[in-house]
């Protein structure tokens, strides 16, 4: 049986996920502006829910872009 390597979460279990912390939120978003899935980031279910809410909140308040800028 092949065991899967468990990914370490980039945030601790007790760390507060805040919509104003743009540096933290950018770790969980692709270059196109999509929210990364839980299996790619290694966070828990509760952390993923809080991250998604924080990213969406930051987008609505114009702190975080909905899509990436097209800089050519």
Swiss-Prot record:
GO MF annotation terms: small ribosomal subunit rRNA binding; structural constituent of ribosome
Subcellular location, principal: plastid
Superkingdom as given in the UniProt entry: Eukaryota
Keyword flag rRNA-binding: yes
Keywords linked to the UniProt accession: Chloroplast, Plastid, Ribonucleoprotein, Ribosomal protein, RNA-binding, rRNA-binding
Any one GO biological process: translation
Subcellular location: Plastid, Chloroplast
One Pfam family this sequence matches: Ribosomal_S18
HAMAP family named in the record: Ribosomal_bS18 (MF_00270)
Family listed: Belongs to the bacterial ribosomal protein bS18 family.
Subunit text: Part of the 30S ribosomal subunit.
Name of this chain's protein: Small ribosomal subunit protein bS18c
Organism: Phaeodactylum tricornutum (strain CCAP 1055/1)
Gene name of the record: rps18
